[in-house]
Swiss-Prot record:
GO terms for biological process: translation. NCBIfam families: L3_bact. One of the primary rRNA binding proteins, it binds directly near the 3'-end of the 23S rRNA, where it nucleates assembly of the 50S subunit. One of its GO terms (molecular function) is rRNA binding. InterPro entries: Ribosomal_uL3, Ribosomal_uL3_bac/org-type, Ribosomal_uL3_CS, Transl_B-barrel_sf. GO terms for cellular component: cytosolic large ribosomal subunit. Keywords: Ribonucleoprotein, Ribosomal protein, RNA-binding, rRNA-binding. It comes from Mycoplasma capricolum subsp. capricolum (strain California kid / ATCC 27343 / NCTC 10154). This is Large ribosomal subunit protein uL3. Part of the 50S ribosomal subunit. Forms a cluster with proteins L14 and L19. Belongs to the universal ribosomal protein uL3 family. Pfam families: Ribosomal_L3. SUPFAM superfamilies: Translation proteins.
Length: 223
């Protein structure tokens, strides 16, 4: 397993040399620092704790500050642990080009956009009721089960929509710009702009393929 932490910037689109338009999400992947290495002997499992994006020292309490000092690192805003990732040392700095290459497939995890309180139609795609004047309900969720005095916990009902941890699997890496710490991922990923995401090696059967060649707009203008 391999992975890295990044920040969602925006969505845009690029063209390949064959003229195909590809929608992509721009992810800023600043250098990640290895803050802790967990092993089976000491922790019972294998994992690497990564941190990215510096934050002010006065926003960190003493236990956290001591944790960062062990890795000779500045305090980090986004700290996450990636399991089954090994071969790294505390304090090591990881760049995106050290982990992934164009053409690989990844799983992206983030916190989805919060939608607030939503009804059953918007939240769970329920069908609405009859809209005639004599109808007893229009946008209600209808029956809640066969037992009158009990509603099961799994029942889909109105409530808080969004703002939940979500993972989208098997997204293709279109391009990596190491000089600007930018990664282009095909399609959309969870979360609003400037939200932090985890980019990990895919766990299902999509294998990497040859990277697509993007159209160089500057070269075409000069020609």
């Amino acid at each position: 397993m391999k992975g890295i932490l990044g920040r969602k910037v925006e969505m845009t689109q690029v063209f390949t040399n064959s003229g195909q338009l590809v929608p992509v999400t721009v992810v800023e992947v600043l250098p990640n620092t290895v803050l802790q290495v967990k092993t089976i002997d000491s922790d019972g499992y294998v994992a690497v704790q990564l941190g990215t994006t510096d934050k002010r020292v006065n926003l960190v309490n003493k236990p956290e500050l001591g944790h960062f000092k062990k890795a000779n690192s500045n305090p980090k805003r986004f700290v996450k642990e990636i399991r089954n990732m090994q071969g790294y040392e505390i304090g090591q700095v990881i760049n995106v080009s050290d982990i992934f290459v164009s053409g690989e497939y990844v799983d992206v995890t983030g916190i989805s956009k919060g939608k607030g309180f939503a009804g059953g139609i918007k939240r769970h795609n329920y069908s609405r009721g009859p809209m005639a004047h004599g109808s007893g309900y229009h946008r209600g969720i209808g029956s809640m089960g066969a037992i009158i005095n009990r509603i099961f916990k799994s029942k889909k009902m109105p409530g808080h929509m969004g703002n939940a941890k979500r993972t989208i699997q098997n997204l293709e890496i279109i391009a990596i710009d190491q000089s600007n710490n930018i990664m282009l991922i095909k399609g959309s990923i969870p979360g609003p702009k400037n939200s932090f995401v985890q980019i990990k090696q895919n766990v299902k059967g999509m294998s990497s393929k040859q990277a697509v060649e993007l159209l160089n707009r500057n070269a075409s203008v000069q020609a």
